[in-house]
């Protein structure tokens, strides 16, 4: 199991498009992927769960991966956050 705190740095936070990209990325891996914010833990493979976190810019999420490809999943998710979900701002 890997856990890391990841900041939300894109201007619009985890809005619908960013949530969809996150869910799509998480779903590409066999391992379990969870996000936690303010005590609420959700499955990152569920777009409704991800959007329920209402994570705006400046929020910090705990990302947890657990399973056979956990490191690859964590690397991909960290890159997605760092790249601002491809939004460039």
Regions found by a protein language model. Give the residues of each.
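Detector for methionine-enriched segments
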Residues: 1, 48-52, 74
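C-terminal structural segments of small proteins and small subunits
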Residues: 56-89
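Compact, glycine-rich, soluble single-domain proteins
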Residues: 7-56, 88
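Intrinsic-disorder/low-complexity, polar/charged segments enriched in Ser/Thr/Lys/Arg/Asp/Glu/Gln
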Residues: 1-5, 60-62
């Amino acid at each position: 199991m890997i856990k890391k705190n990841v900041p939300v740095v894109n201007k619009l936070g985890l809005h619908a498009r960013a949530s969809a990209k996150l869910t799509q990325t998480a779903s590409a891996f066999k391992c379990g992927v969870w996000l936690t914010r303010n005590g609420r833990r959700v499955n990152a493979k569920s777009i409704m769960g991800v959007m329920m976190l209402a994570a705006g810019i400046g929020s910090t999420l705990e990302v947890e991966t657990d399973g056979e490809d956990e490191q690859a999943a964590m690397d991909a998710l960290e890159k997605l956050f760092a790249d601002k979900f491809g939004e460039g701002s």
